[in-house]
Amino acid sequence: MTELSKYRNIGIFAHVDAGKTTTTERILKLTGRIHKAGETHDGESTTDFMVQEAERGITIQSAAVSCFWKDHRFNVIDTPGHVDFTVEVYRSLKVLDGGIAVFCGSGGVEPQSETNWRYANESEVARIIFVNKLDRMGADFLRVVKQTKDVLAATPLVMVLPIGIEDEFKGVVDLLTRQAYVWDETGLPENYSIQEIPADMVDLVEEYREQLIETAVEQDDDLMEAYMEGEEPSIEDLKRCIRKGTRTMAFFPTFCGSAFKNKGMQLVLDAVVDYLPAPNEVDPQPLTDEEGNETGEYAIVSADESLKALAFKIMDDRFGALTFVRIYSGRLKKGDTILNSATGKTERIGRMCEMLANDRIEIESAEAGDIIAIVGMKNVQTGHTLCDVKYPCTLEAMVFPEPVISIAVAPKDKGGSEKMAIAIGKMIAEDPSFRVETDEDSGETILKGMGELHLDIKVDILKRTYGVELIVGEPQVAYRETITQMVEDQYTHKKQSGGSGQFGKIEYIIRPGEPNSGFVFKSSVVGGNVPKEYWPAVEKGFASMMNTGTIAGFPVLDVEFELTDGAYHAVDSSAIAFEIAAKAAFRQSIAKAKPQLLEPIMKVDVFSPDDNVGDVIGDLNRRRGMIKDQVAGVTGVRVKADVPLSEMFGYIGTLRTMTSGRGQFSMEFSHYSPCPNSVADKVVEQVKERKAAEAKK
């Protein structure tokens, strides 16, 4: 077993095409886990093992890989860069202790890089920066360093400088040791020599080395004082300070190279060992009660504690069902019986593996710090806590965003319904941001996801992985409804049909709630006019109707219901009577409260070459977008805007046409906003037409 201080659980984060999967491949090649590094553009990479990933050249799932470097165990997770799969990034951040942020040497800080960086900041994950693709035309290391300051508000700590650039890129100078690492043109990572610093770089190296030392010694008052008095710190002292500053995110050690050309990667691996934290050097995970409130207790990272582990990913592959688990505390052995605190059920551990992406190496035991896969677990979902039967506990839960787009699907042949249902069930277990429901009116199966590409991939998996041929409908926007006016009202439910009847009277106020408040229930009933035992029934009845609004049948958001008075009958009143009264009250009063249709607004971040900025902004304006910011860069302009989701279908094709394929964008849900009347009228009409068509079937 590797000692805990030598574990590094790291993720690799980047924008699409910045080279993070290739970076992972080179890590595996250098650490001896694979003999020939696959290329993403050839569809051969180790971590992009899904057919859809290999074909599209993007990472969709977070693939976990274990490897070793200088007696340290790396558990590496290669995460997606496309915005539709940021839930995978979030899920990975939950179980990581550190990360490598990969930026393109020519593209710089691109839209999705910023999103992933923000997620990592929120999760307090320490990172080093790797500026990749310095062999590319237009690459400029120091320009990207400046962008990380300007765009990400980060403090990069430059650790190396490139020798040459673009076609002339040969290697890097290590500022700490003042040594030049120069690779030959064979493309083999081990074919390098350590040389003197090139004469024309000496002054630049000394300038950046001085900046490095000045920043590092701020982590140690005694060292800083000695440095100010003219005493240069040792390399060991500097590394200790850099490690401390990296762990606290005071700065981010920044390296450069070319993963594709195998140049500069060894220094990045050394930096993972030297500067990123071990599992016992990060804040321990909090424990919560059943409602998700923190208890004040923590999962102490130690093999001597009772078992506390988090299932962070479920995957169905050619070997069967895999549950990926991060062990925070304790030990886990083959044959152990553990408790799933979310279900209250126990389960016996069968086979356990460490993963080389899509291949497995079976293991007998694992302990705190490990990321492993367990084969064949039942009734386990992403976010469930696995713990010692004698010491039940719950780790802080994962929260996933609500889907904003949906499509209707149906099997082409009648016999495919059961096959489709089984396949979708497995896919939901694997991806918590993918949802499914059945339309009550039409009986259609509705798939919901985070974006067009997300659902395209899911449909593709259903067809190719599970062999379900589908009829796929047009994408539908997840509209919502709300109210804009307060209404004071009352409703009496009375039913008499021999024997005991039903009676429940409620007086109430409904008013617009705070944004993102959902449904809020209050009671200001004085005395016993509506006994307290019936209040939950009133709340349940009204809340159950919030799923279907009165404008077009969309779910209702942000409504406050206050029960003010009412009446009951000693014999005829019951919880069910008051629940029915509340349901009828919803139908009666929501229409009086001036309901309004809401549409999802997306935060859109577009990169455009300078020549096309006017076209891009004009197009966003035509899509009812509101321009929030424009940031000029060296190679183009970043345009940030809020745009309705309904206007963004097919946008990538339009952007590529406008920019001759050079434009890029990312998009994530921002908020719900009132629909203009003209748009609302069209939506209502479309819903009516759809229902009429379904009624004829």
Swiss-Prot record:
Places the protein is found: Cytoplasm
Domain tr-type G: 5-280
Entry-linked CDD domains: EF-G, EFG_III, EFG_mtEFG1_IV, EFG_mtEFG_C, EFG_mtEFG_II
Keyword RNA-binding: no
InterPro entries assigned: EFG_II, EFG_III, EFG_III/V, EFG_IV, EFG_V, EFG_V-like, EFTu-like_2, G_TR_CS
SUPFAM superfamilies, alphabetized: EF-G C-terminal domain-like (SSF54980), P-loop containing nucleoside triphosphate hydrolases (SSF52540), Ribosomal protein S5 domain 2-like (SSF54211), Translation proteins (SSF50447)
Keywords: Cytoplasm, Elongation factor, GTP-binding, Nucleotide-binding, Protein biosynthesis
Keyword RNA-binding: no
Binding site residues for GTP: 14-21, 78-82, 132-135
GO cellular component terms listed in the entry, alphabetical order: cytoplasm
Spans through the membrane: none
Database matches in Pfam families: EFG_C, EFG_III, EFG_IV, GTP_EFTU, GTP_EFTU_D2
Molecular function terms from GO: GTP binding; GTPase activity; guanosine tetraphosphate binding; translation elongation factor activity
Function of the protein: Catalyzes the GTP-dependent ribosomal translocation step during translation elongation. During this step, the ribosome changes from the pre-translocational (PRE) to the post-translocational (POST) state as the newly formed A-site-bound peptidyl-tRNA and P-site-bound deacylated tRNA move to the P and E sites, respectively. Catalyzes the coordinated movement of the two tRNA molecules, the mRNA and conformational changes in the ribosome.
Protein family (similarity comment): Belongs to the TRAFAC class translation factor GTPase superfamily. Classic translation factor GTPase family. EF-G/EF-2 subfamily.
NCBIfam families (alphabetical): EF-G (TIGR00484), PRK12740.1-5 (NF009381), small_GTP (TIGR00231)
Protein name: Elongation factor G 2
Source organism of this protein record: Shewanella sp. (strain MR-4)
Gene that encodes the chain: fusA2
